[in-house]
C-alpha cells in the first residue's frame, strides 16, 4: 500500500478544519443560547453532557465499520466493502431508533434521576431540549456511518464540506429561533435537528454513487448479514465499552471537582474549553490512522503498516508540538475575554501548561497510536488497557492528588496526564512487540 505525502495531506487537513469548525460553532452556539437565559444555558449544557454518551456510542459503531471497510479496500474486495457499508448503515439505523424510542419514553424519568436537584426552570429546559434532540439520534448515526465510508476511502474533504454547510444551517437557525421566533430552548434544539438531518440526507445520497470505490447497495442494507455485522461489532463493541466507561469516570470526577470551591470550578471549566481546542490534532489523526493502517492490514502488507505507523506518529508529534505551543501562546489573549479574577486566570494558565505539555509528549501515543492498533484488530487489548488506566490511574490518582495532597483541579489535571502517560508507554510497547500483526479482522 502506498500513500503519498499529498494523499496524507488531503486526508489530514480537511479533517482538522472540520473538527476546528465544529469546535468554533460549539462556542458560537453557547454564546447564542446565553441570550435565552441562564436556565436555558444550564439545561442545554446538562443535556449535551447526557447526549455525549450516545454520540460516543455512534462514533464507536462507525469506527468499527471504518476498520472493516478500510481493510476490505486494502484487499481490493469491492463487493465486501459494499456489504460492510450496507450492514453498518442498517445496524446504525436500528440501534439509533431503539435509543431514540427509549429516550423519548423515559425522557423525564432519566433527567430527574440524573439531574433531579436542579431548579424547575432548568429541568423544564432539559426536558424540552432532550425531547427534540432525541429525534436527531438516527440522523447522527446515519451521518457517522456515511462519514466512516468516505473517510475509509480517504475522501475527508467531502465530510468537511458537509460539516461546513451543516454548521452554517445550525448557526443561522439558532439566530432565527432565538432572536426572531423567541422560541427559547426549542429555538436552539430544532436547528441542530435540521442540520443533522441535512447532513444525514446528503452523505447517504452521496454514498449511493456507484462510481466510488465502495458504495451503498439496497441489497446489502435490507438484509441481515450476521457474519459481516459480527466483524463490525467485534471492533465497535469493545470501543463502545471503553468510551462508555471513560465517560462515566469523567462524570464521577466532575463531582470531585465540585468539592474544590467556586474559583477552581470556574478555572477548570474554562481550561477544559481551551484543552478541547488544543486536543484537535489528536482528534484529527485518529481517523487517519484507522484508514491508512486499516488498508495496509487489509492488503496484508505488514511492512507498509510498520512504515505508516512510524510516519503518522512523526506527523502527529510534530503537528502536536506546533499546535499546542500556538494554543499556549494565545491563551493569555483568550483569557482577556473571560470575566475572571486574576487568581482564576493564573490557575487556568497553569492547567493549560500541564495539559499542552502532556498532549504533546504522551497523547500522540495514547490516542492516535491506539486507533492504529484498533485498525489492525487489536481491540480487546486496547480496551482493557484503556479501562484499567482510566479507572485505576486517572480515577484513584485524581482523589490522591486532588483531595489527599490538596492540589485541587491541578491534581485532577496531573492524574489525567498520568493516565495518558501510562497508556502511551503500554501502547508503544504493544506496537514494538508486533503482536498486532497477528490479528485478522476480515477473512
Where are each of the predicted segments found?
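Short alpha-helical transmembrane segments in multi-pass integral membrane proteins
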Residues: 1-15, 69-136, 180-237, 293-358, ...
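Small-residue hotspots at the loop-to-helix junctions and early N-terminal turns
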Residues: 38-49, 126, 130, 189, ...
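Helix-terminus/linker motif at the lipid-water interface of multi-pass membrane proteins
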Residues: 24-42, 111-120, 176-183, 244-277, ...
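Transmembrane helical elements of multi-pass membrane transporters/channels
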Residues: 10-29, 132, 143, 166, ...
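Residue-level hotspots within the lipid-embedded alpha helices of multi-pass solute transporters
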Residues: 19-23, 56, 96, 100, ...
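N-terminal transmembrane alpha-helices
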Residues: 3-31, 35-36, 52-64, 96-100, ...
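Short runs within selected transmembrane alpha-helices of multi-pass transporters and secretion channels
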Residues: 62, 132-151, 159-170, 188-203, ...
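Small-residue-rich hydrophobic transmembrane alpha-helices
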Residues: 41-101, 140-159, 254, 265-331, ...
Amino acid at each position: 500500500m502506498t500513500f503519498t505525502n499529498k494523499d496524507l495531506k488531503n486526508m489530514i487537513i480537511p479533517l482538522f478544519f472540520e473538527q476546528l469548525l465544529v469546535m468554533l460553532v460549539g462556542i458560537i452556539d453557547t454564546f447564542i443560547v446565553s441570550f435565552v437565559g441562564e436556565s436555558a444555558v444550564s439545561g442545554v449544557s446538562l443535556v449535551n453532557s447526557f447526549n455525549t454518551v450516545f454520540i460516543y456510542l455512534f462514533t464507536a459503531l462507525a469506527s468499527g465499520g471504518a476498520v472493516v471497510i478500510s481493510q476490505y479496500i486494502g484487499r481490493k474486495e469491492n463487493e465486501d466493502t459494499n456489504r460492510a457499508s450496507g450492514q453498518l448503515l442498517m445496524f446504525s439505523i436500528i440501534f439509533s431508533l431503539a435509543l431514540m424510542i427509549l429516550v423519548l419514553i423515559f425522557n423525564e424519568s432519566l433527567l430527574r434521576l440524573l439531574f433531579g436537584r436542579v431548579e424547575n426552570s432548568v429541568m423544564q429546559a432539559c426536558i424540552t431540549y432532550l425531547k427534540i434532540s432525541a429525534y436527531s439520534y438516527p440522523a447522527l448515526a446515519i451521518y457517522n456511518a456515511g462519514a466512516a465510508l468516505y473517510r475509509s476511502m480517504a475522501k475527508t474533504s467531502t465530510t468537511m464540506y458537509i460539516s461546513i454547510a451543516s454548521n452554517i444551517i445550525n448557526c443561522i437557525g439558532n439566530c432565527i429561533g432565538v432572536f426572531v421566533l423567541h422560541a427559547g430552548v426549542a429555538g436552539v434544539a430544532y436547528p441542530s435537528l435540521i442540520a443533522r438531518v441535512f447532513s444525514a440526507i446528503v452523505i447517504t445520497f452521496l454514498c449511493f454513487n456507484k462510481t466510488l470505490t465502495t458504495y451503498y447497495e439496497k441489497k446489502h442494507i435490507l438484509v441481515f448479514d450476521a457474519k459481516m455485522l459480527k466483524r463490525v461489532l467485534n471492533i465497535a463493541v469493545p470501543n463502545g465499552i471503553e468510551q462508555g466507561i471513560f465517560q462515566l469516570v469523567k462524570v464521577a470526577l466532575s463531582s470531585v471537582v465540585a468539592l474544590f470551591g467556586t474559583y477552581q470550578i470556574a478555572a477548570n471549566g474554562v481550561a477544559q474549553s481551551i484543552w478541547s481546542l488544543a486536543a484537535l490534532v489528536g482528534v484529527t489523526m485518529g481517523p487517519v490512522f484507522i484508514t491508512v493502517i486499516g488498508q495496509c492490514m487489509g492488503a496484508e502488507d505488514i511492512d507498509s503498516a510498520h512504515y505508516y505507523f512510524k510516519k503518522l506518529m512523526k506527523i502527529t508529534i510534530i503537528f502536536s508540538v506546533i499546535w499546542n505551543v500556538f494554543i499556549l501562546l494565545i491563551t493569555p489573549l483568550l483569557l482577556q475575554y473571560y470575566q475572571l479574577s486574576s487568581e482564576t486566570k493564573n490557575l487556568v494558565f497553569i492547567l493549560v501548561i500541564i495539559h499542552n505539555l502532556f498532549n504533546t509528549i504522551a497523547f500522540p501515543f495514547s490516542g492516535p497510536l491506539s486507533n492504529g492498533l484498533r485498525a489492525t484488530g487489536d481491540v480487546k487489548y486496547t480496551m482493557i488497557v484503556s479501562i484499567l488506566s482510566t479507572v485505576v490511574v486517572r480515577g484513584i490518582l485524581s482523589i490522591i492528588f486532588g483531595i489527599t495532597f490538596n492540589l485541587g483541579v491541578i491534581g485532577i489535571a496531573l492524574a489525567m496526564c498520568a493516565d495518558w502517560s501510562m497508556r502511551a508507554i503500554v501502547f508503544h510497547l504493544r506496537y514494538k512487540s508486533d503482536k498486532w500483526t497477528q490479528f485478522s479482522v476480515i477473512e
